[in-house]
Amino acid sequence: MSHTMTPSEIVSELDKHIIGQNKAKKAVAVALRNRWRRQQVAEPLRQEITPKNILMIGPTGVGKTEIARRLAKLADAPFIKIEATKFTEVGYVGRDVDTIVRDLAEMAIKQTRESEMKKVRTKAEDAAEDRLLDVLLPPPRDIGFSQPEEKDSNTRQVFRKKLREGQLDDKDIELEVSAGMPSMDIMGPPGMEDMTEQIRTMFAGLGQGKKARRKMKVKEAFKLLIDEEAAKLVNDEELKHKAIANVEQNGIVFLDEIDKIASRSDIGGGEVSRQGVQRDLLPLVEGTTVNTKYGMIKTDHILFIASGAFHLSKPSDLIPELQGRFPIRVELESLSVQDFEAILTQTDASLTKQYQALLNTEEVNLVFAPDGIRRLAEIAFSVNEKVENIGARRLYTVMERLLEDLSFHASKSSGETVTIDAAYVEERLGDLAGNEDLSRYVL
């Protein structure tokens, strides 16, 4: 979807879910569009055009991760979000950075398989239908006469019609289906994920080709047979090549909490592993070849988007080589009272809409007055300023506290309309917001 969208269309799509942060939205929109532009450039220049990686800097709760989440849905491309803190330097106990590309490859295989199976779904449905009809109506043994065949064909058409209309959905049938090996969870030591995955794949392959008879409803059997027939129609080798090409040309990696692996200039010692992770990330970001079970994957054209709050460290605390690999820097602003108001009312799945929908299930009609919204925004902003700035996440705490009693007694208020105005908010949250000691623990 994203490759046909212009940067302004991508920003409009992000605006539905994220308030403000236009610089960050512009940067990711241009980066996404540049993937498409690069594909239109002729070789050999196309190979020379590498993605410009992005570093998003801003306090927690202002939309860094949300931009990544929404981008993942927009980008019709392999996408993975990982925490930089999960990785350790090669040789230490923990995951090494090559697993990023392996996980991305797994994601691409799954994505490509789903896409290929959708393409052959109609054929798979026809084949599954025939297999079901063979079970429901076994073919006649005596094939010497044409009349029974004709009669059987008519009966088959009647059953086919019933099957399509769902009249046979609850009928029990016995069916021969592929018997996979029972799923086996192998616990491996930290840092040995690759070997563990290979052992798991080896055991999974042992059950291939075996059949087993199972009793089930027609509806369940139809779904199972569609998947089986679609899997037969998909060429695994071709799928693998497509997935690898998709990772190499369109892959996006979102590196969260990158500030946590930055070595602070004012602290000495204990920083070896952090710098080591940065040095391990470096070849991955600038372009290297990683060995995966699906083949070799080049990372030259994978887009990396890193983000961090940088409270205790600065972007300049990252090693110079890594800094140079993130040429686009975007600063995200802290949220204002107006931003909080917009978050509560303007986004597609705003908190107010969520609570209205939840309480509507108990026939409680929740109405948010503009002055009530304003007061909620002021309280969230005030607590963030006084206690700890956790951005938009503060609204979850404030809203839960505000509607706690109403949610608890909702069944008793069935059929009522409750208006959340400034007085209602003040009555339930005013004292807490004003008392810094109380708000520190409660809000």
From Swiss-Prot:
Q: Tell where it localizes.
A: Cytoplasm
* Region span, Disordered: 139-158
Enumerate the UniProt keywords alphabetically: ATP-binding, Chaperone, Cytoplasm, Nucleotide-binding
Pfam families tied to this protein: AAA, AAA_2
A GO CC term? HslUV protease complex
For biological process, the GO terms are: protein unfolding; proteolysis involved in protein catabolic process
Q: Its domain of life?
A: Bacteria
Residues that bind ATP: I19, G61, V62, G63, K64, T65, E66, D256, E321, R393
- Single GO molecular function: ATP hydrolysis activity
Q: Does the keyword Cytoplasm apply?
A: yes
Chief place where the protein resides: cytoplasm
Q: What does the subunit section of this Swiss-Prot or TrEMBL entry state?
A: A double ring-shaped homohexamer of HslV is capped on each side by a ring-shaped HslU homohexamer. The assembly of the HslU/HslV complex is dependent on binding of ATP.
Belongs to which family?
Answer: Belongs to the ClpX chaperone family. HslU subfamily.
What function is annotated for this protein? ATPase subunit of a proteasome-like degradation complex; this subunit has chaperone activity. The binding of ATP and its subsequent hydrolysis by HslU are essential for unfolding of protein substrates subsequently hydrolyzed by HslV. HslU recognizes the N-terminal part of its protein substrates and unfolds these before they are guided to HslV for hydrolysis.
Query: What protein name does the entry list?
Result: ATP-dependent protease ATPase subunit HslU
Q: Which organism is it from?
A: Cupriavidus taiwanensis (strain DSM 17343 / BCRC 17206 / CCUG 44338 / CIP 107171 / LMG 19424 / R1) (Ralstonia taiwanensis (strain LMG 19424))
The top of its lineage is:
Bacteria, Pseudomonadati, Pseudomonadota, Betaproteobacteria, Burkholderiales
